[in-house]
Amino acid sequence: MKYIPPLNFSPVVSTDVSLYRSGYPMPLNYSFIKHQLHLKTIIYIGDKDRPLEEYQSFLESEKIKYYHIFMDSSRDEGIQERMNQVLHLVLDVRNYPILVHSNKGKHRVGVVVGIIRKLLQGWSTAGICQEYGLFSGGMKDGVDLEFITMFETNLKIPRNVIPGFAKHCLYLNELEAAEGSDDESGSESILTAKQPI
């Protein structure tokens, strides 16, 4: 059988977990997703209200969890909170393997991958810009790249669910249990990224 990946498909992480990026999967891609990726979770970053009917049926038949994070552009009101929602999903090993897709697999998913590269993998701004340009056909959206560069967050993540690839990132700090507290109170890490003043 011939397997056809979705538009602009590529691995983002393939270490202890598998994280992929792509454009919107079409019916001709479903066999590839089913037999090659074995997904638990799909995160759609885009402006479509609901999955196409065939896509919805495929997700249900494969028991794939589907999350829609609305995004028209990186200028959207509330975009910070939406990117934090994506990070919460990506920082939970129970959601893997994960596919993050937008409509074409270019700009919107490029923003998400850029933030992951910056915060969780320690990529340089130059490397992030180069990858963004590769998937967008050389079109580098200055607003998107500025958003990635200036992105700030402050998330609490349970330690025991953080995937191995992210455990040693520069922005992830262990929260210490307060003296005299029970064992559960120190069971989180905090992902903090602030711009220097």
Curated annotation (Swiss-Prot):
CDD domains: PFA-DSP_Oca2. The modification Phosphoserine is found at S181. PROSITE patterns: TYR_PHOSPHATASE_DUAL. InterPro entries: Prot-tyrosine_phosphatase-like, Siw14-like, TYR_PHOSPHATASE_DUAL_dom. Coiled coil: none annotated. Its main location: cytoplasm. GO terms for molecular function: inositol diphosphate tetrakisphosphate diphosphatase activity; phosphatase activity. Residues 10-160 form the Tyrosine-protein phosphatase domain. It holds the Pfam family Y_phosphatase2. Keywords: Cytoplasm, Hydrolase, Phosphoprotein. GO terms for cellular component: cytoplasm. It is found in: Cytoplasm. The keyword Phosphoprotein applies. Present with 4530 molecules/cell in log phase SD medium. Required for normal growth in the presence of linoleic acid hydroperoxide (LoaOOH). Belongs to the protein-tyrosine phosphatase family. This is Tyrosine-protein phosphatase-like protein OCA2. It comes from Saccharomyces cerevisiae (strain ATCC 204508 / S288c).
